[in-house]
């Protein structure tokens, strides 16, 4: 059975509205190509039915919070945090790094999820939305949840793009961080640095060499805090 490591309903928000497909931009800067969201990040039977059901419940709990425009209550904050932790761990790259084998992944996912969730609730108690304006946009990728550190600061932010126009970040801070470049460029470069093979976008004109240059200039190294 084909199973998704990135929730299809969320990835659909990155479809090109004219093509109804997502643009896949290879990390090695080869020519981009488009595919339906339902055909991306699928793998055959990489997890057990029980684990698939456990993860589906996480995605279901998060759905109302994603739709809400106002401030989240405690239950909604928990649901969004669970979704972020799920997508931090479940992608193909993280599975290679966190687990020794597919069997190890299926046996230990729940315990690793709970461990990372507890750390996240402690270290990232505040969630903020950032809305992109004008022609700026956010990308996502096959490692959708990234952790970045604003230049000159010690604390990390955990971020993911909800859509091409909305970024969520989790932190322990009450003020938004300041960046020397547009937050869209900084986050997109971090998404590029963190991805395994592909950056995903609703646009064909994402410039991968530019993202690679920004990642080098700011010494962006993907990290998961422990």
Segments (PLM) and residue ranges:
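Alpha-helical structural context detector biased toward long hydrophobic helices
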Residues: 1-226
């Amino acid at each position: 059975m084909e199973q998704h490591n990135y929730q299809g309903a969320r990835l659909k928000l990155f479809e090109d509205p004219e093509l109804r497909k997502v643009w896949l931009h290879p990390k090695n800067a080869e020519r981009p190509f488009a595919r339906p969201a339902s055909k991306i990040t699928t793998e055959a039977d990489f997890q057990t039915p029980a684990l698939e059901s456990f993860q589906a419940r996480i995605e279901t709990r998060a759905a109302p919070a994603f739709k809400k425009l106002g401030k989240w209550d405690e239950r909604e904050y928990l649901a969004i945090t669970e979704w972020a932790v799920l997508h931090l761990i479940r992608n193909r790259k993280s599975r290679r790094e966190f687990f020794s084998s597919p069997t190890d992944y299926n046996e230990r996912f729940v315990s690793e999820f709970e461990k990372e969730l507890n750390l996240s609730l402690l270290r990232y108690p505040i969630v903020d939305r950032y809305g992109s304006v004008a022609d700026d946009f956010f990308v996502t990728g096959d490692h959708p949840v990234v952790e970045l550190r604003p230049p000159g600061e010690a604390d990390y932010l955990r971020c993911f793009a909800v859509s091409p126009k909305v970024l969520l970040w989790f932190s322990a801070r009450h003020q938004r961080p300041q960046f020397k470049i547009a937050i869209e460029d900084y986050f997109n470069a971090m998404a590029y640095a963190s991805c395994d093979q592909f950056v995903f976008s609703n646009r064909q004109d994402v410039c991968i060499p530019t993202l690679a240059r920004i990642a080098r200039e700011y010494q962006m190294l993907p990290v998961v805090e422990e």
